[in-house]
Amino acid sequence: STQFAIRDAGLYEPVLELAARTAREWSKTPVLLIAGLAGRTEQACQEAQIALAQGYHAGMLSLAAMKGATVDALIEHCEAVAASIPLVGFYLQPAVGGIALPAEFWRRFAAIENVIAIKIAPFDRYRTLDVVRGVVAAGAQDRITLYTGNDDHIVLDLLAPYAVKRGEAQVTVRIRGGLLGHWSVWTRSAVEQLQRIHAAVESGSVPASLLALDSRVTDCNSAFFDVANGFAGCIPGCHEV
């Protein structure tokens, strides 16, 4: 897990290069590489070009630098970056620098053709549903893959079907995986848990023990995400563990 501040030390491109090279050296199969993109439009577009030059396939776009912008301005920003690189949307919780984004934003964002996925990480049930509702309203649920970033609700986000209305029709979608700081530690166990969850979903039968795992994982997360101090030490917590 890195930090936004790597840019201040001139480490953005070196970190991307190291991560891409390491993935190529260690993996026997092709790995999808997603770079973090931040800042206002000029910076985000420049970072997209750096990511492409390093062999990245997509960019996950933080909107934290766009605080106070209208939905129209946010969409214009996203469209500009999407013209350079396939985009992964990122709903970051306001407690750590994100901004509140209504369902209307997510509908318009999902309508951008070069959007391929969204990381949903507002740590809020209502806002999580706003993303799902927006994607469904745009008719983009088959094109856009949803990932949970809600470290406080990992297991149930992956287990539960999300059913929302589009007109008179009910559309059911699922969150397919996770982009989680939590999974930066004990990664093999995280992979095994995800495989177990997928198997349960495919079988149509979810055991109570798997449902109970949600609260256990959340309790564990509270320790190294420094919940008691408003997430102030969440990145050092992941690094320490």
Task: Pin down the residues of each PLM region.
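Active-site beta->alpha loop and helix N-cap motifs at the rims of alpha/beta catalytic domains
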Residues: 1-106
